[in-house]
Regions:
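Predominantly flavin-linked oxidoreductase catalytic cores and closely associated redox partners
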Residues: 120-220, 224-226, 231-232
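Internal hydrophobic alpha-helix adjacent to the cofactor/substrate pocket in enzyme cavities
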Residues: 182, 303-329
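Beta1-alpha1 glycine-rich phosphate/pyrophosphate-binding loop at the start
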Residues: 2-77, 162-163, 171-205
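FAD-site-proximal beta/loop scaffold in flavoenzymes
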Residues: 124-155, 235-309, 313
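Short glycine-rich anion-binding loops that position phosphate/pyrophosphate groups of nucleotides
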Residues: 18, 112-115, 247-249
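A Rossmann-like FAD-binding core segment of flavoenzymes
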Residues: 79-86, 102, 179-274, 323-325
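FAD-binding core/adjacent interface of flavoenzyme oxidoreductases
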Residues: 2-7, 74-160, 242
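Short, conserved active-site loop motifs that form the nucleotide-linked donor/cofactor pocket
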Residues: 34, 76-77, 221-223, 284
Length: 333
């Protein structure tokens, strides 16, 4: 006997933390008659909490990434290597940059956010913390040049590192990169500065976390400039710019013609209710950085991780027509 055709198609768009949890649990919890499809341009997705450890040299790159095609194979899901070009939530379909149109019964978005680094003088190496694929390429090249540098001057000029962004990514990346550079070449002096437009680092985090971060920065010799907006003309001279500021929604989310009538915040992030559903289209869910909770949350991976089990329960409930579960963000992490 041939297998019955699927009754519902569930599309997971984005290789994020929450979707990894859905895929891991799917073999044990999948309801009958559901086709699961995963769409992402990135086959290997980083666990964001381990990226600083990779930058510092504690982990290899393969240690910090999640192999999504392998997860899909174990879950019996179809893997589609493509990015969203357009969403029509009224027609319940995605148009992909591959040219494929993908219809869905339920859609979950876990596509993260993006960064737009500035255009700098060619003499400045710019490393944006997203996307990871570009960060890896740029960082590998930087370390290769750093180790190959002659460093034979009697009093070599310090290498100037500037990190922009006072969130967790900015703080952790400058500490990790400075430590890596000094460890690889203790003969070459490194000067570092972190710049943020906010009044302190780690806004929205507990005061204890801010104190620990400031202490670590001080011990590493990283100067901190607060209340400063980065501009090309006013930025201090640097050799390496670490860009971790201004998380943005993806272009299709910011463009009305490419997102249809999907409700988004003024910045383009998908507005969700207490059950992680779109406030305008209940067949669309959104989690992690791409989503806008009614009380804005920091763009930190720990939230997407904690959203994962709730997302799984609510996707299954939607497919089966049962009650949804409310999400309560953690207050400590």
């Amino acid at each position: 006997m041939s297998a019955s055709p699927p009754v519902h198609r569930l599309v997971l768009a984005g290789a994020g933390h929450a979707h990894a949890q859905v895929l891991k649990a799917w073999p044990d919890r999948a309801p009958p008659g559901v086709e699961l499809v995963v769409v992402s341009p990135h086959a290997m997705a980083p666990y964001s909490g381990m990226v600083p450890g990779w930058l510092a040299g504690t982990y290899g790159f393969q240690d910090i990434v999640i192999d999504f095609p392998a997860l899909c194979a174990r879950a019996g899901a179809r893997w589609v290597p493509a990015a969203i070009d357009r969403l029509d939530p009224d027609r319940q379909c995605l148009e992909l940059d591959s040219g494929e149109t993908l219809h869905y019964d339920f859609l979950s978005l876990n596509t993260g956010s993006t960064l737009v680094p500035p255009v700098c003088d060619p003499s400045v190496t710019v490393l944006s913390m997203r996307p990871l694929s570009q960060l890896k390429t740029g960082y590998d090249q930087l370390l290769e040049r750093w180790q190959a540098g002659a460093g034979t001057d009697a009093e070599p000029r310090p290498v100037r590192v500037l990190a922009v962004g006072g969130g967790a990514a900015g703080v952790e990346s400058v500490l990790a990169v400075v430590n890596r550079l000094r460890t690889l070449r203790p003969d070459r002096p490194v000067q570092a500065e972190l710049q943020t437009r906010g009044p302190t680092v780690l806004p929205g985090y507990p005061s204890g976390a801010r104190r620990l971060a400031l202490r670590a920065l001080q011990q590493a010799g990283v100067a901190v400039r607060t209340g400063t907006r980065w501009t090309t003309g006013s930025a201090p001279a640097c050799d390496l710019l670490l860009w971790a500021a201004g998380a943005q929604a993806h272009a299709w989310q910011r463009t009305p013609q490419r997102r249809g009538r999907l409700a988004v915040s003024p910045e383009g992030f998908v507005q969700i209710d207490g059950c992680l559903r779109s406030v305008s289209h209940p067949r669309v869910f959104a989690v992690g950085d791409c989503a806008h909770w009614h009380q804005p949350l920091p763009k930190a991976g720990v939230y997407a991780v904690r959203m994962g089990p709730v997302l799984l329960d609510n996707l299954l409930a939607s497919l089966q027509g049962t009650a949804l579960r409310a999400y309560a963000p953690q207050t400590r992490f």
